[in-house]
């Protein structure tokens, strides 16, 4: 007489598959660094913008978390800035990067290859223009309200958000956070 009950292995496999599906539903899509009100910022975009920013400025200490935070802030500030009259074109961003490269002593025109790097520059320009304006306080208050009301999900690989919504870089207890390795003399 054959048993109609599933074997222990099949039950275990089904339970593991169900648990995997449940966990997958709780995490960001693969390759996603963050989503802001449904708009995805991919890990590739963060990596490209970080690399291009380091190449432009020479600042080796710029982290993907800082770039991701800026891209998220830019996603929130841009529509508010445009409405307040602080729209910035791609050409203006490229000119800004050229000026930054020149000020840093670069002899070559900086490569602006990614849309995310343009978005990073757009945020920096808009922020600086708004900061210098008489209506800065009102615009930044509106941006802060937008941030508090936004649906922001951050891949835990990059950061977590604290109660104020600020990004806190993820630190893994099992990864030693010691001094960086010395660079070879050369």
PLM features: what roles do these ranges have?
Residues 21-25, 80, 129:
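Hydrophobic membrane-targeting alpha-helices
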Residues 28-117:
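N-terminal targeting/tethering segments
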Residues 1-62, 148-186:
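Short, low-structural-confidence N-terminal segments
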Residues 98, 105-186:
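PPIase-associated folding chaperone regions across multiple families
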Residues 12, 32, 67, 128-129:
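Residues at structural and domain junctions
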């Amino acid at each position: 007489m054959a048993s109609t009950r599933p074997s222990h292995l099949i039950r275990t496999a089904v339970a593991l598959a169900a648990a995997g599906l449940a966990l997958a539903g709780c995490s960001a899509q693969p390759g996603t660094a963050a989503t802001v009100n449904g708009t995805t910022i991919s890990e590739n975009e963060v990596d490209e913008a970080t690399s291009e920013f380091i190449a432009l400025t020479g600042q080796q200490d710029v982290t993907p978390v800082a770039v991701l935070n800026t891209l998220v802030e830019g996603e929130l500030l841009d529509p508010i800035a445009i409405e307040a009259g602080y729209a910035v074109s791609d050409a203006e961003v490229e000119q800004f990067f050229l000026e930054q490269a020149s000020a840093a002593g670069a002899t070559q025109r900086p490569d602006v290859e990614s849309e995310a790097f343009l978005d990073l520059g757009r945020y920096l320009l808009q922020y600086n223009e708004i900061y210098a304006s008489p209506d800065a306080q009102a615009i930044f208050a509106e941006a802060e309200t937008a941030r508090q009301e936004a649906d922001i999900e951050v891949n835990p690989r990059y950061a977590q958000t604290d109660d104020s919504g600020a990004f806190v870089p993820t630190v893994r207890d099992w990864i030693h956070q010691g001094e960086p390795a010395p660079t070879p003399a050369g």
